[in-house]
């Protein structure tokens, strides 16, 4: 199978690298393409963009890099459409990944899996609707989030 993974930080790189190793153990022909990091690269596959080129923290840095952020998003969407993976796996990083999920759901027939679901705080309640609409499978490491997503209750 062809797997497209997207992470945006070091912790996502760590968790995704473990997931990739587990997938490879079950699917020796696994072909990975990703926005990720060094740990994912060590497992194998093609890195499209390093997460260090994606992550901006704080209002001002995000504002200053909006053009780069949108260019990375456009590149990611185009790469997914061009490569046609069997599945897209998103790892945390909701600001970027929820937009990618929406695009993939609307423009392709590729299933979207969310590994390590986004944190659903009271002020991000709308994420529950977006996840239900755009994500085919949700895998959470915090059981609290799975029950919240199931009943539309915000996690506080």
Where are these regions (language model features)?
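N-terminal subdomain of nucleotide-sugar transferases
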Residues: 1-39
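Conserved nucleotide-sugar phosphate-binding/catalytic loop shared by glycosyltransferases and other
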Residues: 5-7, 33-79
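An aromatic- and histidine-rich active-site surface loop
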Residues: 42, 88-106
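Short N-terminal targeting/anchoring amphipathic segment
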Residues: 75-95
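A short beta-strand/loop micro-motif in the catalytic core of glycosyltransferases
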Residues: 89, 135-142
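A short, histidine- and acid-enriched strand-loop-helix "catalytic/donor-clamping" loop
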Residues: 112-126
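A conserved, positively charged/aromatic
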Residues: 122-136
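Conserved small/polar residues in nucleotide/adenosyl-binding loops
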Residues: 145-152
């Amino acid at each position: 199978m062809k797997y497209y993974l997207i992470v945006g930080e070091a912790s996502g790189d760590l968790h995704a690298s473990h997931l990739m190793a587990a997938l490879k153990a079950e699917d020796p022909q696994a072909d990975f393409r990703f926005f990720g990091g060094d740990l994912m690269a060590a497992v194998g596959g093609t890195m499209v963009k390093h997460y260090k080129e994606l992550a901006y923290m704080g209002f001002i840095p995000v504002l200053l890099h909006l053009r780069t952020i949108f260019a990375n998003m456009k590149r990611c969407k185009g790469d997914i459409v061009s490569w046609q993976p069997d599945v897209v796996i998103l790892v945390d990083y909701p600001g970027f990944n929820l937009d990618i999920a929406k695009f993939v759901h609307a423009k392709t027939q590729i299933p979207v899996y969310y590994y390590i679901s986004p944190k659903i705080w009271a002020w991000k309640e709308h994420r529950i609707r977006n996840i239900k609409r755009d994500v085919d499978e949700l895998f959470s490491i915090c059981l609290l989030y799975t029950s919240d997503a199931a009943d539309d209750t915000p996690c506080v």
